[in-house]
Amino acid sequence: MNDFYEGLGNDKKLSIIAGPCVFEDSNLAVDIASSLSETCKKYDVNFCFKMSFDKANRTSIKGYRGKGIELAMNVFDHIHSELGVSTITDVHDAWQAEIINTSIIQIPAFLCRQTDLLEAAVLTGKPVNVKKGQFLSPWEMKNVVDKLKSFGYNR
């Protein structure tokens, strides 16, 4: 399992997922991850670095979306291997789930019911974090959980 997820629980220390909203620069991303990691170690906080390689949900077509998956994968690898920090990012398509090298895969709220995307995320064997869509009631998320379980997810 993933180190970050093993540290979660009511009887465990505080956990945070933090990082820049969008991937803008490799050096900046590593600097942010390093600084957050040091601060979390100082205060004994469980930490996972989050960064979006593509903000596909921008309101305007002119909005900055990120540097893309290929460059982001290099940064995620560096942060995990050099800093020892777990990583997480959103995926928007099944093929992205299949190749992304983060420790954890996150499904964005607006895509939380997409069956093929959920299946692809589960098939990676990684922890999957699904954000609740604003259009769903809390009890409707049971259907999302049922989909995950139907693909063999048991975390």
Spans of model-derived segments:
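N-terminal active-site wall of soluble small-molecule enzyme domains
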Residues: 51-106, 112-118
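Hydrophobic faces of well-ordered beta-strands that scaffold small-molecule active sites
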Residues: 16-19, 47-51, 87-89, 105-107, ...
